[in-house]
Amino acid sequence: MEESEGQKCEPNLPPSGDSRQMPQQGRSNLHVTSQEDAACRRPRERLSNGNARAQVSKPARNIPRRHTLGGPRSSKEILGMQPSEMDRKREAFLEHLKQKYPHHATAIMGHQERLRDQTKSPKLSHSPQPPNLGDPVEHLSETSGDSLEAMSEGEVPSPFARGSRTRASLPVVRSANQTKERSLGVLYLQYGDETKQLRMPNEVTSTDTIRALFVSAFPQQLTMKMLESPSVAIYIKDDSRNVYYELNDVRNIQDRSLLKVYNKDPSHAFNHMTKAVNGDMRMQREIVYARGDGLVAPRPGSVAHPPHVIPNSPPSTPVPHSLPPSPSRIPYGGSRPMAIPGNATIPRDRLSSLPVSRSISPSPSAILERRDVKPDEDMSSKNLVMFRNEGFYADPYLYHEGRMSIASSHGGHPLDVPDHVIAYHRTAIRSASAYCSPSLQAEMHMEQSLYRQKSRKYPDSHLPTLGSKTPPASPHRVGDLRMIDLHPHLNTHGPPHTLQPDRASPSRQSFKKEPGTLVYIEKPRNTSGLSSLVDLGPPLVEKQGFAYSTTTIPKDRETRERMQAMEKQIASLTGLVQSALFKGPITSSSKEASSEKMVKATANRNQADGAGTAHVSAGKVLGSVEFSLPPSQPLPAGTSPIHTSLLDMRRNVAELRLQLQQMRQLQLQNQEILRAMMKKAELEISNKVKETMKRLEDPVQRQRTLVEQERQKYLHEEERIVKKLCELEDFVEDLKKDSSSTGRVVTLKDVEDGAFLLRQVGEAVATLKGEFPTLQNKMRAVLRIEVEAVRFLKEEPHKLDSLLKRVRSMTDVLTMLRRHVTDGLLKGTDASQAAQYVAMEKATAAEVLKHQEETAHAPGQPLHCSTGSPGDVKSEVVPLSTMTVHHVQSSPVVMQPSQHSSALMNPAQNLPGGTRPHTASPPAITQEVTSAQSAPGPQSPQTPVNGSSMQSLFIEEIHSVSAKNRAVSIEKAEKKWEEKRQNLEHYNGKEFEKLLEEAQANIMKSIPNLEMPPASSPVSKGDAAGDKLELSEDSPNSEQELDKIGGKSPPPPPPPPRRSYLPGSGLTTTRSGDVVYTGRSMSKVSSEDPGPTPQTRATKCPPEEPASAWAPSPPPVPAPSSKEEEEEEEEGDKIMAELQAFQKCSFMDVNPNSHAEQSRANSHLKDTRAGATAPPKEKKNLEFYHEDVRKSDVECENGPQVESQKVTAGALRPSGPPKWERVMVDSISDTSRTSECRADTFTEENATPNKSLFRDSRNYSQKNVPKVSFSSSGLNSLEGEINKGPNVSGLQCAIPDLENQKLNFGKTKEIGQQGQENADKSHIPLPTRSAEFSIHDVKTQDQDVPVTGYGQVVLRSKVGRHANMNMNEDGESTPSSPSEEHTATDNIAFMITKTAVQVLSSGEVHDIVSQKGQDVQTVNIDGRKETASQHEGTEGEEPVVCLDKKPVIIIFDEPMDIRSAYKRLSTIFEECDEELERMLTEEKIEEEEEDENEDSGVRTSSQMSCEQVDSRSDRMGQKAETQSQPHVLSAELLTPGVQGVRKAEQRKLSSADSPDSGNKCGMVDDQFESPKKKFKFKFPKKQLAALTQAIRTGTKTGKKTLQVVVYEEEEEDGTLKQHKEAKRFEITRSQPEDALKTMARRQEQLSPEGTLPASRTDEIRKSTYRTLDSLEQTIKQLENTISEMSPRALVDTSCSSNRDCGASLPHMAQEVSPRSLLVLDEVPPAPEPPTSISPASRKGSSTTPQTSRMPVPMTSKNRPGSLDKASKQSKLQDPRQYRQANGSAKKAGGDCKPTSPSLPASKIPALSPSSGKSSSLPSASGDSSNLPNAPATKPSIASTPLSPQAGRSAHSASLIPSVSNGSLKFQSPPHAGKGHHHLSFALQTQNGRAAPTTSSSSSPPSPASPTSLNQGARGIRTIHTPSLASYKAQNGSSSKATPSTAKETS
């Protein structure tokens, strides 16, 4: 075939005249070729391989090459001929078109001849052309062979060689072509309309090879640069699919692959080339292929056409054009083989295969559009399209449409003749496409042959419109549609006729082929069609004849003229249609396409309809197509058909217009639908966005998102810094290597660069570190909510149940309380009273439940509960409940502490009585009896056996109080809970479930601990758990009670009952009603505290409270208010502590549980319920603690007392502002009550110390005596319970307790008053402080109680007296407080409290001094001289002004500027700093000795008061100090020990204030101890630093009131400074003033009325809230500045510890001083916010628990040891050290918490020595000697440890508690827990040391210490021991430190 084809081609090619031969040959070949082509192009390629044909085709191809490259011409002379041939062809094609119009045989013949000529020349020009022409096979083969061969042999080599123009050579390509290894096969390269055959290179290595081939094939048109541009793509045809795919893998190139260069930019595509040579060549090639496929029949036409085509369309070789039509024809033929059955079929297939691919390849658009359009549908259509593509390359867009339409039209027409016509037409079309727009071509195609011819005509005139129109539309699709339309019509007419008319092909083809002229396209088409028919042979001719030829030709002849006219009309019509369509379609290309298709379809239909004959259709088509070229197009023969077609065209136009209108309408409708859809989508999107925004706007979610973003930002920054650091390290390493190696020299510039980079990195790291605390706080805040929610969900049911129970029991309790008021209040000291207390507790348990509900509503009431000793228990419980609720987050275990005091919230659980008493305690406070019962109540909870009687007493108390407060409390609780629920609603169920599950798991872990304590303790624990739950549930009640206790006036607003604290949560209420976050230490303290308050309670509390505190009973509801406050304040800590506590609770049943629970208690109210909390601790440490108690009843009593106080302090602190508020309220009420009680009787006060005091203040004025006796019996019963709980210890304690109760009762009263005064003062400045003071009072009571065995009772009595004194003093102080706020007009005086430095006028100073008396330490500074005068310093202790105990007033005799006064003050502080430490050490020792007796208790109260004062503000501190002084006076009245304690307390207050003004602390201490002695400012270094900074600020700003934020625990972290600053700036004078005023008023009212007006309570609450807010802010600030504060904090801590301890010790013996220091230290932490200071106090007792919340609980326990560490830490002032110390403190504290009561004693001594080192070494020794006091005076330990702790880490045992608390609190919840534990320990130790209970830490400390140590040792033993050791070393009080260490380690 190849040879034949080649031969034929050659003859044909050389002689363009041979075109006819070619057509003939082509025909014969076409059959073969077409078949082969149909199968695939390879046959053609093979043909192309033929030399002759190659030559022939080459020329054909060369034509394009002419354009492509001059070089390729060398392949054959044909190349040279091509240009001339092309011109000739064009001319001939025009002639053919003219002839074609007649559509007569002659025309066809002429067309055929032309085609033949074309074939020859076209073959020369395009190998495809010949096939397209007449000789299908021959031509195709010749053309293909020639072109292929020429291209592959001649051209390929030359292209590569000559292609060197673009690229000299691609080795692969060149080698392949040069070697001419045909074995590889041939490649068809198509560019534009040109198709060239090239020999495949030996190897195609890359696309560059292909590009080189293309460049060599088309050197003129293509360059490597062009081909490499992104806009040019090489496509390879997939024969199977007739689709071009982008050539991605050169391995896909195989023999006969058709590659096409496709310019993605249609405008740039191949229009120039295409129109010129490329189009022709491509058309030729397509024709060749198509013809090979199906040109058998067409070939004659093609042959005839080629000449025409060539002349007609120089741009696009006519042959190619004709060829495409032939392929399309063939498809039609295929469809209707009738036309050219054999030929058509074969060619069609071939055409479809080859042409389609070609068509696809020819036009870039075609490729894409073909896919879209479906040229594939009809192989013929595809062929047409392909041909068209070739033509199209001239105008890709035009061609596409043309192609489409051609393909469709051809597909529609089965006749081959039409195909041929089309082929010619195609040639025309190609040229048309070159000239026309695709739309025009498409239309022409629609008409099919006619259309094509017309489009050829149109192309020039018409095309623009159509073209433009079509391009927008997908030409292919338009073509298809038109084809479809045409086909149906044609079919209806009859396949032959239809096809023929459509293909009126001869004329049409000629016309189309003439497209060069476009006018003649139709004629040529007809001619070509005829020729093709002829060429095809009889079949074609016949087909044409019957279908087209005969009719068509005559028609053409007849109508030629008419046709021309009609065509003109049609052209105009088409123009109209086009314009219309164009306008419409322009809007949417798809619409245009469809409209065009429709138009073409209609035209076709019209043609078919109008011309029943093919001619008519053809005429129509021609008319429409030609009318654009009317002048040039000769009217086809048969005007009538043309006329008909014109009419049809008009109809079509009308229809098209209608369709256009419809389409426009449709478009509008679609637009409307789209708009609607868009609107709908917009609505949906907006809704979603709104939902998302709402979700984002949800505060919780938004906060979470913001925090997460911040965290990611932080992490990103961190990563960046780490990267920088790594790079810097590498750089430095390289420098080191370079420096070490002699070869390279390190330049100074390199080093400097490294240093510069290092500085940058260091700054970045520092910045990052500064940013972390903020992020930490934010993340904690976010987590806090979840934890709270979980707790709430878990505790709410219990809370509700307990509330209901309490409400139910309220009536009974009230009845019992009335009975007790009349019958049993004075039985407090009798053994029967223990039973009574048990019964009362049982009764109170119910009452407490109710009360707790009320308390939840009125948190202030829990403070009232604190008033009486039963009240204290209750108030502890209530605060606990309040705190618990607040701290439940951290640990529901809080309920454990509660359980003592009736497990405040869960009286039912552990000791219904005990729990209820706690709950009822607030009511009890309201009633005198209640307070007395309250104390027993707590004991009762401690001792399950006594629980019943105590519970009854408690219930009665609670009833009395609850009767008053129940409704309000319940309402408040309900409101709070409702709020909480609403808040919780923010959480989704799943989260809650998860949190609940986790919390439950933690709680379950903790619960075993509840049951772990000794038998009694397990029972207590169970009760405690229940009580705690009840407390938690009743938290509102507890708060209510507190409020009631607070003296009808609502105490600090009860924190919302957010959470009930589990018994193990570690929240307790102190006697003062403060909610203490008790860690294990707290539990112990609570136990001890209950003991002292009522012996029964002390006894009972230790076991039960430990159970309660330690047993993670159901989430204690107690202290919801406190909890809320705590939640806010220590949510993060709580969360951490809770997690830790839960985890630790399980393994630390005694110690760990205490620790864990204490953490919780710290978070909650364990410490607040000193007794309650202590019991859990005691229960867990019960064995140890009981042993300790047995060893030393006094110690045990004191230990519990101290512990209770510590717990209270810790609880207060942890509980946060709410706790403080409660405590303050309680303290106030206590003070008032105590005042009354004092007036009434010591015994009464003993009975009512805290709770009684508060209640007495309100209720007890009348019930004082009964209440006192009840307190005694309550104490006894409590003591008995404690004894039972501790077994021996508790019992022993009970006996001494009764004795000491009276003794200590007075002392306790004094202390309590003092503490309460302090608390009141603190309360005024900071409600939390009041709570702390209350705790202090409780502690004091506890300490006193220990003397009797229930030092707590005594303490409470003392607290009661103290409270009364405080109230009086506060009353005085209140005016003073306001005056304090005012700057001195004449001589300036500074009132330095722990939290604030206030400028006072002399008048204000006088008022304050007169009001507060001993509670304020005054230092007169004449010039440089400072004289400390103790307002009411009874004992001549060293005149050390220590903020620990009292506010320090520094009076400058000479008038001066505020700023200068500040400067002076700072100078004084600096001068006094060194002395302060020494003084503190000595003072501590002295105070320890003094306090050994009963000063411990007083001191504890004092410390608490001081802490409270500290936490409040300087003014508060001063008031507290003033209170302390009055208390000290009371102490003087009572006993020197008590006085000492009071002094210590006062000093502590001053120390507490002193952190604000460190020197003042020392001054106050000195004043306290010996006004005559030269005052020394004893401030923990942290405090001192804080004061110094505050003063500095004052110097700058000249503000009258400076907030001193001393965070003892933060000291190490630097939180202290932050706290100080935060406090200094956040705590406004108004707050302290308000608090003080409120407290003073409340106390005053309470004293006279025994009740606080609601308004006062409201005021207190408000002030408390304000304080809380400020505290929170302060905490944040502190946390932010922790690192900065770390050093100062450490210094302050040591100073503070010394001051605190010193102050306390001076007042309460050395131990009290340490304790005060501890409290102070704790207070400084408390100052973080006012609450913080309270927490600091709480940390002393319960503050540690705060820290304890987290790991801190352990620290609390280890606090003694931790204290040492704290000193170290503060001395080290290294955050890491701080962390380590705190960590050890945390662990130790947490672990030791349970054993805290005993451990604190031992630890405190150890710490005391360490403290002693700073200034409490003496205290430390004093602690050892005066262990009872020392334990009682946690500060003693705190002092000793604080000193060192201040030096190292004031966060250790006592100082650590405070420091850890503060530091930890700010640093982390764990620290808060630590603080609690430490405080607990300190308190416990103080209690243990308390002269009443434990004379020396030796006996209790050893057991306690071991226990503590064991517990603490677990967590912090190692650290603790080192800390102790370091403390020893630092303190130089090795003796004490050693014993303590030994004990602790043991």
From Swiss-Prot:
Compositionally biased region (Low complexity): 352-367, 1806-1825, 1890-1899
Cellular component GO terms, alphabetical: centrosome; cytoplasm
Phosphoserine modifications at: 169, 361, 365, 474, 809, 1032, 1035, 1038, 1049, 1466, 1741, 1843, 1899, 1902, 1905
One Pfam match: AIP3
Tissue: Expressed predominantly in the notochord and mesonephros during embryogenesis as well as in other areas such as the epithalamus sulcus, lens vesicle, inner retinal layer, heart, hepatic primordial surface, infundibulum, surface ectoderm, hind gut and limb bud mesenchyme. In adults, expressed in a range of tissues including the nucleus pulposus, corpus callosum, kidney, cardiac muscle, Sertoli cells and hair follicles.
Residues linked to a glycan: S357
Regions of compositional bias (Acidic residues) in chain numbering: 1484-1495
Coiled-coil intervals, chain numbering: 557-581, 644-685, 962-990, 1469-1495, 1659-1688
Residue numbers carrying Phosphothreonine: T470
InterPro entries xrefs: AIP3-like_C (IPR022782), SRCIN1 (IPR051825)
Subunit structure: Interacts with CPNE4 (via VWFA domain).
Name of protein: Sickle tail protein
Upper classification of the organism: Eukaryota, Metazoa, Chordata, Craniata, Vertebrata
